[in-house]
């Protein structure tokens, strides 16, 4: 049993099995689709996800993806992609990464969040260029573990099986907080490098108020947590 502390950003507690979501980007495999075509394809995908969110009264998440489309259409980013580098994933991702680093260095939380948005869009664009499909199979009572999480990630997941979210990074304005609140599930952010302690299928108990996580709790701790959860219900 191991205890990890982060920042609780939603009420409630839950116990479930860890699903570690790795949204890594592969910069060694060249793109099968050139930059401009990939942008159009990704915008179409985001537009479909926006419609689905709006149809389910999840307007905040739809607004996030609207902002993602604006990033893809931002001339300060797109005009840096030259014709000879339209298939170079390193070149494309490097431009998104540089733009994000400028904003991340600023003090304002708004700009830090926008930096995370640019990185997220860059990752999704690289996957689109490579025609990479990310498949996530979430079983019932899953605790979703990730470095960061956005509506672009969760829109293709069966979030009905998720009972909690744990993030390595993020602040109170992170998009994962919006997702968690809309779904009514606890969320703990900012656990840092301690997230590496969590493996797939570990039992994880989290308290969305205190920010405390317990990895593989013993029988006594698990009984206490289940009692607390019943009182909340």
What is the predicted function of each stretch?
Residues 1-233:
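Non-catalytic, soluble scaffold/interaction modules
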